[in-house]
């Protein structure tokens, strides 16, 4: 039974997901349905958490919009996601960057990874 489930999950997984880590700045383009119209909406911010669970993988992106912190959790292999683009590589030493929630201004900056 588990082989059938694994086979179905493998078929549903996206192959074009770029490699990114916590601390990286990414731009996620998401399909949004408004009434009968369908359009792309970009959400750009810093990846603060990644949850690796195969087909059920997810990542959290945080940005500051009009002085207010906004976080959004995306399912990595969701058909709603059109594309993920890595804008900047960040150098951090933790897997979960939840401490950025309390920080503002210069203390919330992340150094750029050179490699």
From Swiss-Prot:
GO annotation, cellular component aspect: cytosolic large ribosomal subunit
Pfam families: Ribosomal_L19 (PF01245)
Gene3D superfamilies assigned to the protein according to its UniProt record, in alphabetical order: 2.30.30.790
Residues forming coiled coils: none
Gene Ontology terms, MF aspect: structural constituent of ribosome
Keywords for the protein's UniProt record, in alphabetical order: Ribonucleoprotein, Ribosomal protein
InterPro entries: Ribosomal_bL19, Ribosomal_bL19_CS, Ribosomal_bL19_sf, Translation_prot_SH3-like_sf
One BP term from GO: translation
Keyword Nucleus: no
Keyword Transmembrane helix: no
PROSITE patterns noted in UniProt: RIBOSOMAL_L19
Top-level taxon in the UniProt lineage: Bacteria
Disulphide-bridged cysteine pairs: none
NCBIfam families hit by this protein: rplS_bact (TIGR01024)
Family the entry assigns: Belongs to the bacterial ribosomal protein bL19 family.
Function summary: This protein is located at the 30S-50S ribosomal subunit interface and may play a role in the structure and function of the aminoacyl-tRNA binding site.
Name of the molecule in the record: Large ribosomal subunit protein bL19
Native source organism of the sequence: Pectobacterium atrosepticum (strain SCRI 1043 / ATCC BAA-672)
Taxonomic lineage of the native organism: Bacteria, Pseudomonadati, Pseudomonadota, Gammaproteobacteria, Enterobacterales
